[in-house]
Regions:
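Terminal, regulation- and interaction-focused segments at domain boundaries
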Residues: 1-31
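Preference for bulky hydrophobic residues occupying beta-strand positions
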Residues: 3-7, 43-45, 56, 67
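Ordered, soluble secondary-structure elements with a strong preference for glycine-centered loop motifs
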Residues: 8, 12-15, 68, 72-80
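Short, charged/polar low-complexity linear motifs in solvent-exposed/disordered segments
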Residues: 33-34, 60-62, 70, 82-84, ...
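Intrinsically disordered, low-complexity regulatory segments enriched in Ser/Thr/Pro
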Residues: 55-75
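A conserved amphipathic terminal alpha-helix motif
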Residues: 73-102
């Protein structure tokens, strides 16, 4: 499963916001997020019954998620969830302090 999400923030601001998203996913769903470096994070866990195992990379105004395909029945739900979270956390109109962590 692949998701490519463009953003209008600086890479540093996007990184900071996605670190907050990682905290949210860990606190809310128990999804383990490990930052490999300033451009890559590994995700591992479950949302509902969907296994989320993949890598998120930041580069030149794009957040790219590459992960295990959960299968036909759950693919759209998993994609929608990840895209909606990226849209919410990478929205320049939303202050970082307003982004949920749990």
């Amino acid at each position: 499963m692949e998701i490519d999400y463009p953003y209008a923030l600086s890479d540093q601001d996007a990184l900071s916001r996605l670190q907050i998203l990682g905290t949210y996913l860990s606190n809310r769903h128990g999804i383990k997020v490990t930052w490999v470096d300033d451009k890559r994070a590994r995700f591992n866990g479950k949302y509902l019954v969907v296994k989320i195992d993949g890598e998120l990379t930041l580069d030149g105004g794009h957040a790219r998620f590459r992960g295990e395909d959960p299968g036909f029945l759950w693919r759209n739900r998993a994609k929608d969830y990840i895209q909606n979270k990226l849209a919410a956390y990478l929205d320049p109109k939303t202050a970082q302090s307003a982004l949920p962590t749990s």
